[in-house]
């Protein structure tokens, strides 16, 4: 007798082994029709998988997050089915699930075109309409090799070669004549795959290495139903309008070019925006007791070997040589801050000591991963490090938490999730040290009275970290600030203080950043605000425009008055109609446009308009200054 325990605690008995689908059928025809997969004793399995022992079972449908992920994975296989029917000569590589979608990498002698993508999507719809069952067969490894060898799928064979010899059998999933291998689970029938859309094609490299052959990557998205798909498409259309690259070009903020992949050319208005963010964060440093420092861009590799970066991070580092010495361009600022700390003798009474730096770092990101200013190779962090006693961790983390929330609120973010990234597989130190570090973060967040989610395996190699995930105006989540506890690096780099017993001890090192990469944060700000920044943040806060040449001198005097008050202001004295000027600066998302005609000139006033088209009427220059000052960030 097989006893199956359901999520509500009820039990069902079966005389012999039973499949997930059969259990669903015993509950009701409606549930059976909706069943995508099952979760047996916490493990996701196919609907066709048989349960041969007493177990707990949760039926997975499209209403579950796991169900939507399975739909996406099955859609990737459906891409393979359609592609092989249309282009039988191509070679299939791999098709994983990603956030809100999936992709499939394919080797093709020629690049796919938009017409190809349309044809593939059409064929997928035709295959879905056939309403066929997806068949799973657990197959011995040798037979799997034979299956793909007969089909000439050399990349599948390479993937099998990389698998552990302990794997003696694999799941093959058959979409009619098409077969793919996968851990699964997958949908039992193509009727679950109707709400999908292919989104784009890009290039990729085999194993992510530019030295290897180039592949074609077909991206798509899939959802539980058409309503969810349509909502996603609307979100993506809005995201496209907000694309920081589009707005950056339209507002003349920055550009990127082929000769400097992953590096940003900042234009005057973009650099003005940067400076507003940097000066705001510099004030945060000062108010929080951080001494600002500046450390070298390149350091001898011996220092990176001591810090642990050489063993754990060298693939992402740039190197250079001079006079038979090898140097690394810094990917992180922490070892430099330890060198500053090490230049003096410190007592336990001196701690905590806090350093902050707008530190320029470089990381050798794969070219395919670069994305505007959101993913770059050269970036600047609002990086800070606190050297403290173990007893001070809680108060320092608590203070940082409050500080970070205040910054995010000032920049317009109020939906914030907090997560703790725990020890990764590849790490420094022993489990006892990690236990202590992770407990310290949990304790500090507990004192703050906040809820958090834990992320096993996602901490840095030298310590666990708190992560701040911010939701933007269109519901996307961005990971920004971090606070990391590090018991390892101070010892590796010789950081010491003298304790109350005159003994030398290693301090705890806290790594913290609030906005993280300045480039990325500015890209997020652009998209969050759709280029319509709050007046305190806008690259140009005010434009003063004349109606005729008769007001030119007065316009310039107004500009100077505002500039002398520290506002970012420009004058538009072009020989253009005022309606044209208003439209142009409105499109540039300038917060305020001050229009000056003869009446305003005579009265020492300005006519104030907002970028939303609101007419605020005529006011004195001093009254407008008071209004603008009231809108500045604290």
UniProtKB/Swiss-Prot annotation:
CDD domains: TGS_ThrRS, ThrRS_anticodon, ThrRS_core. GO terms for molecular function: ATP binding; metal ion binding; threonine-tRNA ligase activity; tRNA binding. It comes from the Bacteria. It catalyses: tRNA(Thr) + L-threonine + ATP = L-threonyl-tRNA(Thr) + AMP + diphosphate + H(+). Residues 1-61 form the TGS domain. Zn(2+) binds at residues 334, 385, 511. Catalyzes the attachment of threonine to tRNA(Thr) in a two-step reaction: L-threonine is first activated by ATP to form Thr-AMP and then transferred to the acceptor end of tRNA(Thr). Also edits incorrectly charged L-seryl-tRNA(Thr). This is Threonine--tRNA ligase. It comes from Xanthomonas euvesicatoria pv. vesicatoria (strain 85-10) (Xanthomonas campestris pv. vesicatoria). The lineage of its organism: Bacteria, Pseudomonadati, Pseudomonadota, Gammaproteobacteria, Lysobacterales. The gene is thrS.
